[in-house]
Regions:
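Multi-pass membrane glycosyltransferase architecture that uses lipid-linked
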Residues: 1-96, 143-286
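Aromatic-rich transmembrane-lumenal/periplasmic boundary elements in polytopic membrane proteins
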Residues: 78-121
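Membrane-helix interface motif
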Residues: 87-88, 118-128, 233-236
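Flexible, active-site-adjacent loop/turn segments at secondary-structure boundaries
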Residues: 95, 103, 134-136, 191
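Juxtamembrane membrane-water interface segments that cap and precede transmembrane helices
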Residues: 123-142
Length: 286
């Protein structure tokens, strides 16, 4: 669905762990879900976002003792995988973390696409650099400010998603939708948005049931199709900021991803009715 990009990256592996963690939760195996999510996080960090959902389910079914088991399983997996690297090459591990956290605002990210759009439409000057991670980013105080604001917004949006799930979730569809939501939140507010990140969404969005699931799946297909307009063959024109229409396409694609987030968090009619009956019990984005 992403053309040549999907053949040269390993994002399928964390996606498999993530969907396996969701499947474990659907079958009531919260501790296993924590372990699977932690294993996926050692490949790409995003599956760790599923652990709070698993802990919520463990709390509902077994209280603090079950939560402790879930946390223990996640920590054990992380220690088993990352522990040897921390012992053999601690500086290498900390350097890898530094490289990831210090990266510039990647040009395809939602935040950077606003800069690119302004450059294409109004001629706003941009300073694009090659980052240590091999991607292209926007440098400068404005980009750093946007990166910081995105980090705060991500933390707030994730917290809201978890609170909403804790207060309002009623069944398997809500669990799958919550899992997809936190991953989309991560993509929207991250300072990096590589096209292969969309692989993460495919299994989660397709699992969502009902009309919301159909609409979300249709929108995701459109997002994948639009991404192929500029990736990989027109990407060079984009990071060089030499072809305005490519910047417009990237901006439009990112607006669609934001729209996907809006679709996932929009209250269902039943949830809206619950808010009217008991506003203290029902909570969420909407």
């Amino acid at each position: 669905m992403l053309g040549p990009i999907s053949y040269f990256h390993f994002d399928y592996f964390p996606a498999i762990f993530a969907v396996a963690a969701v499947a474990a939760l659907l079958y009531g195996r919260g501790v296993l879900a924590c372990a699977l999510a932690a294993a996926g996080a050692t490949v790409k960090v995003y599956p760790v976002l599923l652990i709070p959902l698993a802990l919520i389910e463990l709390w509902r079914r077994g209280g603090a003792r079950a939560v402790a088991k879930g946390v223990g399983a996640a920590v054990a997996v992380l220690a088993a995988v990352l522990g040897p690297f921390a012992v053999v090459a601690p500086h290498g591990l900390t350097w890898a973390l530094h490289v990831e956290t210090a990266r510039a605002l990647e040009v395809e990210s939602v935040g950077a696409s606003f800069f690119a759009f302004a450059h294409a439409l109004f001629g706003v000057h941009l300073h694009v650099v090659l980052t240590s991670g091999g991607s292209h980013g926007i440098a400068g105080p404005g980009a750093r400010t946007v990166s910081a604001l995105l980090a705060v917004a991500m933390a707030a949006a994730l917290a809201a998603a978890y609170v909403r799930y804790f207060l309002c979730a009623r069944g398997p569809e809500d669990l799958v939708a919550a899992a997809a939501t936190v991953v989309v939140v991560y993509i929207v507010f991250s300072k990096v948005f590589s096209p292969q990140y969309l692989v993460w969404l495919i299994p989660l969005v397709l699992l969502i049931g009902g009309r919301r699931g159909l609409r979300a799946s249709a929108l995701l297909i459109v997002i994948l199709a639009v991404t192929q307009i500029f990736e990989p063959y027109n990407y060079v024109h984009y990071f060089r900021m030499s072809t305005p229409w490519v910047a417009y396409v990237v901006f439009f694609r990112n607006l669609l991803v934001v729209g996907l987030l809006g679709l996932l968090v929009w209250p269902k009619p039943l949830e809206q009715h619950a808010q009217q009956l008991d506003p203290d019990r029902a909570s969420g984005f909407g």
